[in-house]
UniProtKB/Swiss-Prot annotation:
Its EC number is 1.14.14.1. The gene is cyp1a1. This is Cytochrome P450 1A1. Cytochromes P450 are a group of heme-thiolate monooxygenases. They oxidize a variety of structurally unrelated compounds, including steroids, fatty acids, and xenobiotics. It catalyses: an organic molecule + reduced [NADPH--hemoprotein reductase] + O2 = an alcohol + oxidized [NADPH--hemoprotein reductase] + H2O + H(+). One of its GO terms (biological process) is hormone biosynthetic process. Gene3D superfamilies: Cytochrome P450 (1.10.630.10).
Length: 521
């Protein structure tokens, strides 16, 4: 993720603007006067010279991941820009990022205290919270444990190895029927519109023990809100980088608060219902598991980490929000690439037909036998890089990296897009080529090459749902490729241009899908 300055800050009077500008100029001059001294033996961070007040905003453009990649060619893998009045260190290069987030993980494990982050999940977000002490670690461990244990529970029937597989298979089957119905009625479909609801239903089943119809207005509204959230967070809030703007009216901030309030209200309502019907001997879903843990902690006088009801809402909100946005975006991009590369789509279908057959649905256990599908997914993550940045990190103490001094509380951006398109790592990185991940005979994926792809962060802030997300993308894709053939609309050009945001989506479009002949009944 990248946070950029936006020119819109609301309607303010001329006098208010003059006062704000004067104050910002004074603060800027004071900051320049007290510029950080560099310890002996370390170097000052390189980077472009910032303008007063606005910093290097004008040099970022509408595609900051590309602008910062270009800057890294000039300044190296560790350099500094200034966004508004906040210094930001930008890290790129696989080895540099690995050094920072893994080998020096404690130094870079923080989150910056950005104004807008305080309002995400009412400040209780695992992903965005500045907290990284004992309580945060306990909450993260709890969320990870609940997510993993419920996804691995046995399915309700022997044909499914686990609850996660059961949810995905049932939603995948429903998605195929839904797309077939839409095609017969309209002749085309919006890939994002239908995929995102199916994926949302998987995480709803895991978190809340319920599913929604594809036309359910509450769920469709929340999916729309999630899309808005990604765009707003991705485009940035000026008050995050020019603190005085926190006190001026802003239509963008008002919209941001509305989005977060709606999400919190939705989850709070469901958590409250779970408290009312909670039965310790019948844990139905992740929310029940978290409530059970909360109740145990309240009874345990020796527990040094208590879990409040508000923080349960925050954890569930995090899991719900992140649980469908990343997966649905990956799947939607996958369908676009299938249409853009019909020869790859046919090769994937042939692999599934040969290794799984057409008489049963693909399962998680088939994954090792479908190396080209796994390579295709890796190349989707690499080539699209729809997660161009991680959520910003922050240094927890004065530190150094590659010989450069980085003060405590410095905001740090990780440029995942640069790593995934680095010509030092990838041959012809601009080409879409799943074979780059396969062994010479095509029988298996090269694990070392696969690990070079950066999509979920790394280190102490790595996405806790990565394994589940990868399994979801794999199984949904295997199911729909087995049954459907995706095509462009005749005469229409496929637009693969990404739209910048927290997760980069492709432009909304319509495609065609036909049932594979041998699957028609």
């Amino acid at each position: 993720m990248m946070l950029m300055m936006l020119p819109f800050i609301g309607s303010v009077s001329v006098s208010e603007s003059l006062v704000a500008m004067t104050t910002m100029c004074l603060v800027y001059l004071i900051l320049k006067f007290f510029q950080t001294e560099i310890p002996e033996g370390l170097l000052r961070l390189p980077g472009p010279k910032p303008l007063p007040i606005i910093g290097n905003v004008l040099g970022l453009g509408s595609k900051p991941y590309l602008s910062l990649t270009d800057m890294s060619k000039r300044y190296g893998h560790v350099f500094q820009i200034q966004i508004g009045m906040r210094p930001v260190v930008v890290l790129s290069g696989s080895e540099t990022v690995r050094q920072a987030l893994i080998k020096q993980g404690d130094d870079f494990a923080g989150r910056p205290d950005l104004y807008s982050f305080r309002f995400i999940n009412a400040g209780k977000s695992l992903a965005f919270s500045t907290d990284q002490a004992g309580v945060w670690r306990a909450r993260r461990k709890l969320a990870y444990s609940a997510l993993r244990s419920f996804s691995n529970l046995e399915g309700t029937t022997p044909e499914y190895s686990c609850v996660l597989e059961e949810h995905i298979c049932k939603e995948g089957e429903y998605l195929i029927k839904q797309l077939n119905t839409v095609m017969k009625a309209d002749g085309s479909f919006d890939p994002f519109r239908h995929i995102v609801v199916s994926v949302a239903n998987v995480i709803c089943g895991m978190c809340f023990g319920r599913r929604y119809d594809h036309d359910d207005q509450e769920l469709v509204g929340l999916v729309t809100l999630s899309d808005e959230f990604g765009r707003v967070v991705g485009s940035g809030n000026p008050a995050d980088f020019i603190p005085i703007l926190q006190y001026l009216p802003s239509a963008a901030m008002k919209n941001f608060l509305r989005i977060n309030s709606r999400f919190t209200e939705f989850v709070q309502k469901i958590v409250t219902e779970h408290y009312t019907t909670f039965d310790k001997d019948n844990i139905r879903d992740i929310t029940d598991s978290l409530i059970d843990h909360c109740e145990d902690r309240k009874l345990d006088e020796n527990s040094n980490v208590q879990m409040s009801d508000e923080k349960i809402v925050g954890i569930v909100n995090d899991l719900f929000g992140a649980g469908f946005d990343t997966v649905s975006t990956a799947l939607s991009w996958s369908v676009m690439y299938l249409v853009a590369h019909p020869e790859i789509q046919e090769r994937l279908y042939q692999e599934i037909e040969d290794k799984v057959g057409l008489d049963r649905m693909p399962l998680l256990s088939d994954k090792p036998n479908l190396p080209f599908l796994e390579a295709f997914i890796l190349e989707i993550l690499r080539h699209s890089s729809f997660l161009p940045f991680t959520i910003p990190h922050c240094t927890t103490k004065d530190t150094s990296l590659n010989g450069y001094f980085i003060p405590k509380d410095t905001c740090v951006f990780i440029n995942q897009w640069q790593i995934n398109h680095d010509p030092e790592l990838w041959k012809d990185p601009s080409s879409f080529n799943p074979d780059r991940f396969l062994s010479a005979d095509g029988s298996e994926v090269n694990k070392l090459d696969g690990e070079k792809v950066m999509a979920f962060g790394m280190g102490k802030r790595r996405c806790i749902g990565e394994v589940i997300a990868r399994n979801e993308v794999y199984l949904f894709l295997a199911i729909i490729i087995q049954k459907l053939h995706f095509l462009p609309i005749p005469g229409e050009k496929l637009d693969m241009t990404p739209e910048y945001g927290l997760t980069m989506k492709h432009k909304r479009c319509h495609l065609k899908a036909t049932m594979r002949a041998r699957n028609e009944h």
